[in-house]
């Protein structure tokens, strides 16, 4: 799996925590209109139009369960701690999987040849047509780490403040982070607006027990959804 904290690369929407329901509807608005010069007593010749695209997202309940017996606990009390740690790791891995599955769906695409370098990142950013590049990040897999580190711009960049967990430095002024979840020969350039984590319920842990069998259950549970909500804010770069 990966040690990357994917939550820091997403927008987190907790609106559903304050409202009843399991669905979140998002409208993307498009305004078309132009300012006209008008003569005295005359009206504009065309009216502006506002349209919107509606997308509905339904959160999911996700949980897992592990069991241990009283006898196991008496033999080794660490079984409970180890089980809780394993369950927490499993929850994080599930979130990371959802994030990388969603960001890979972006329809904004670019390519590179040989090794990933500064120019490839610049070309990918250009496809996003951004005025403000604040918040951009680059995600690579471990095998590409050496390629990035050999890039002249990367070597010349500052290696100071670490903005994201897993970050190895900057390229073109953009933080570069490494994850095993990034597919081979693939690079993602994105902002947090690309993928949204809709949270209905934070992770909670419920316990149960079958008394006459001395079987204890630990059930971690979360309610939410990870979705690609703005494909224009993520570029998928693949090797040509």
Predicted segments with their positions:
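Short, structured patches in soluble enzyme cores that scaffold and shape functional sites
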Residues: 70, 140-142, 222
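Structural beta-strand/beta-sheet cores of well-ordered domains, especially the beta-sheet scaffolds
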Residues: 22-24, 64, 134-136, 172-174, ...
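Short helix/loop capping segments that flank catalytic or ligand/cofactor-binding pockets
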Residues: 34-37, 76, 147-150, 227-229
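Alpha-helical scaffold segments that mediate packing/assembly in large oligomeric complexes
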Residues: 63, 67-131, 236-240
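Extended oligomerization regions of viral-like shell subunits
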Residues: 119-205, 209
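Protruding loop/beta-arch "assembly-hinge" segments enriched in small, turn-prone residues
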Residues: 1-9, 13, 181-183, 189-193, ...
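N-terminal "assembly arms/tails" that initiate or stabilize quaternary assembly
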Residues: 1-52, 194-202, 211-213
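Long, hydrophobic/aromatic-enriched structural stretches that serve as scaffold segments
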Residues: 41-75
